[in-house]
């Protein structure tokens, strides 16, 4: 394309007409005008910039945009407006379904399993999918379903219980949000709370709320009543208790277990009419920390037709047993291996000898250029996280630390700084190991070996999300010889290349498995510091001398006082 010709289009240049003028104009070759070519090139470039032009689903939605706008208006009667006669479902029989499942290594079991969807077009023809919800999906860049969405969405829309396990970053949040929003739309005649989502952490609950809010944008259930989604925060809990806000105002509520139980026990929120109960990170919500709280929530949801769903990146056997006991003929969906990590993550083990060697290893990563931001570093305790933060801060690394002792406001600010790129390296405990979706994390470092294979999968799952590649490095020492075995098993199941010594390593004995389960495999670690032992001893002696001097002065003062 001639850029000067484009820039001077507005100029008025008089030219002679006739055959002579055409002969003098070298842009006309073989009877074709170059200006015409330029216009074609321009239109071609515009098409290339329109990333979704080749999607059939986009063009269909654009054709119906005016109809959708009418449906969005709160002053007009809602219409389904789903003219689905021209759209044919991609998956029509069990042969096509098995071929699709084979392509993404999906394992689905249960009674009377619904066919998966091959695209979002399937939802329109099979379930009269709402056009406004489809628009919201497309506007947020979701044009094709992920494997776990292909399986779980039709199961949920058939009102079946589901136990789903998929790799980190595989789209599990939308797998339960899309059918939930659709079911709320279908049940628009009933007012009050119908959908309840439970999450183990505030950060994850907030993230789910944001995604749910995007999906439900501009969706009206009645003439002037929009679909209402709420995050059960401390302030909202107080409003519900004081009857400032009615508990029937919201259609979907997202909460952590303890906060929800507190509101329910104060009779500020009625869960008896809830029809859809979803446990995100189910393995955490049904372990010994949360199991009693989760049981209380289940007891409060007394609707006979209650649909239950459990989602996680790892599903231990005890969670499967609980699922079978509380669910009615559940469909079990496993994408990949239930104990494997995301295949987009390159996993690596580094032997550091001792605790001092870990700091040397991090500094070596910086020197060798492997320390590429954004980076998340996981440690096993708050004390160790603080200590590492001070060490790296003095190395002039753009770093901050997040843990349970920080306030909610501080944690939110740090997460926001990390997401915007203002912060390069984030040190944290397992408080951020689950569910939080950080776009583009290049590297995850396990400074301390995780307590279990499930914790390892969730930690390294902060990278390699949404189809991107990532890297995970785990430091280990001599005392981690038992604790490292589950990590090696995950690496093997994920298809990672492992060293010869890993292949030759003996399988875990029953005693070793019990020690890992009870936390005995992780022995007490030394303090993180680079101060030499002689300097430490010198400081300790100085502190003892100062303390002794103060003690002597106090004794002298007390003697003088009594002598008087």
From Swiss-Prot:
Entry annotated with the keyword RNA-binding: yes
Domain Helicase C-terminal, first and last residues per copy: 344-506
Keywords, sorted A to Z: ATP-binding, Helicase, Hydrolase, Nucleotide-binding, Nucleus, Ribosome biogenesis, RNA-binding, rRNA processing
Subcellular location as annotated: Nucleus, Nucleolus
Reaction(s) the record says it catalyses: ATP + H2O = ADP + phosphate + H(+)
Motif Q motif per UniProt: ranges: 122-150
Main location: nucleus
Gene3D superfamilies listed in its UniProt record: P-loop containing nucleotide triphosphate hydrolases
GO molecular function per UniProt: ATP binding; ATP hydrolysis activity; RNA binding; RNA helicase activity
UniProt motif DEAD box: location: 280-283
UniProt GO BP: maturation of SSU-rRNA
All copies of domain Helicase ATP-binding, residue ranges: 153-333
Pfam families in alphabetical order: DEAD, Helicase_C
Compositionally biased spans, kind Basic and acidic residues: 13-23, 62-86, 553-564
UniProt key word Nuclease: no
Binding site for ATP: 166-173
GO cellular component, one term: cytosol
E.C. no: 3.6.4.13
Chain intervals for the UniProt region annotation (Disordered): 1-25, 62-87, 512-564
Function: ATP-dependent RNA helicase involved in 40S ribosomal subunit biogenesis. Required for the processing and cleavage of 35S pre-rRNA at sites A0, A1, and A2, leading to mature 18S rRNA.
Comment text on domains: The Q motif is unique to and characteristic of the DEAD box family of RNA helicases and controls ATP binding and hydrolysis.
Quaternary structure note: Interacts with the U3 snoRNA and is associated with the 90S and 40S pre-ribosomes. This association requires the presence of RRP5. Also interacts with OSH3.
Family: Belongs to the DEAD box helicase family. DDX52/ROK1 subfamily.
Protein name (database record): ATP-dependent RNA helicase ROK1
Organism for this UniProt entry: Saccharomyces cerevisiae (strain YJM789) (Baker's yeast)
């Amino acid at each position: 394309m001639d850029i000067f010709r484009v820039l001077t289009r507005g100029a008025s240049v008089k030219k002679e007409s006739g055959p002579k003028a055409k002969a003098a104009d070298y842009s006309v070759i073989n009877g074709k005008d170059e200006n015409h070519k330029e216009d074609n090139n321009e239109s071609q470039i515009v098409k290339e910039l329109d990333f979704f032009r080749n999607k059939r689903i986009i063009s269909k939605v654009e054709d119906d945009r005016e109809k959708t706008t009418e449906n969005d208006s709160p002053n007009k009667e809602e219409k389904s407006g789903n003219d689905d006669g021209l759209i044919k479902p991609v998956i029509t029989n069990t042969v096509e379904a098995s071929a699709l499942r084979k392509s993404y290594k999906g394992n689905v079991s249960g009674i009377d399993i619904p066919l998966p969807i091959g695209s979002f077009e399937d939802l329109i023809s099979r379930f009269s999918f709402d056009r406004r919800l489809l628009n919201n999906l497309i506007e947020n860049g979701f044009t094709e379903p992920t494997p776990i969405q292909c399986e779980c969405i039709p199961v949920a829309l058939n009102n079946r219980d589901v136990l789903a396990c998929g790799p980190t970053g595989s789209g599990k949040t939308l797998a339960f949000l899309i059918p939930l929003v659709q079911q709320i739309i279908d049940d628009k005649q009933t007012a009050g709370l119908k959908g309840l989502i439970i999450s183990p952490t505030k950060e994850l609950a907030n993230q789910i709320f944001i995604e749910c809010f995007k999906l439900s944008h501009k969706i009206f259930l009645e003439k002037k009543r929009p679909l209402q989604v709420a995050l059960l925060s401390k302030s909202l809990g107080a409003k519900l208790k004081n009857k400032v806000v009615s508990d029937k105002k919201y259609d979907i509520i997202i909460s952590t277990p303890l906060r929800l139980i507190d509101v329910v026990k104060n009779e500020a929120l009625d869960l008896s009419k809830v029809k859809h109960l979803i446990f995100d990170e189910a393995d955490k919500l049904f372990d010994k920390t949360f199991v009693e709280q989760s049981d209380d929530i289940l007891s409060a949801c007394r609707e006979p037709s209650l649909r239950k769903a459990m989602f996680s990146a790892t599903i231990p056997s005890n969670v499967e047993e609980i699922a079978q006991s509380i669910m009615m003929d559940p469909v079990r969906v496993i994408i990949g291996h239930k104990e494997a990590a995301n295949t987009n993550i390159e996993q690596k083990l580094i032997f550091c000898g001792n605790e001092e060697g870990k700091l040397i290893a991090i500094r070596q990563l910086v020197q060798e250029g492997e320390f590429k931001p954004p980076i998340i570093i996981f440690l096993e305790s708050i004390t160790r996280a603080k200590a590492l933060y001070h060490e790296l801060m003095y190395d002039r690394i753009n770093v901050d630390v997040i843990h349970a002792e920080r306030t909610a406001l501080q944690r939110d600010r740090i997460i926001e700084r990390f997401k915007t790129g203002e912060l390069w390296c984030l040190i944290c405990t397992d408080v951020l190991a689950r569910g939080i979706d950080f776009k583009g994390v290049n590297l995850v470092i396990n400074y301390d070996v995780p307590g279990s294979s499930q914790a390892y999968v969730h930690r390294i799952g902060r990278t390699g999300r949404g189809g991107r590649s990532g890297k995970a490095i785990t430091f280990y020492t001599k005392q981690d010889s038992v604790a490292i075995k589950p990590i090696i098993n995950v690496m093997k199941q994920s298809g990672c290349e492992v060293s010869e010594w890993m292949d030759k390593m003996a399988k875990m004995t029953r005693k070793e498995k019990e020690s890992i389960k009870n936390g005995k495999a992780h022995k007490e670690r030394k303090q993180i510091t680079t101060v030499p032992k002689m300097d430490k001893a010198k400081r300790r002696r100085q502190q003892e001398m100062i303390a002794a001097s103060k003690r002597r002065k106090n004794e002298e003062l007390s003697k003088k006082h009594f002598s008087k």
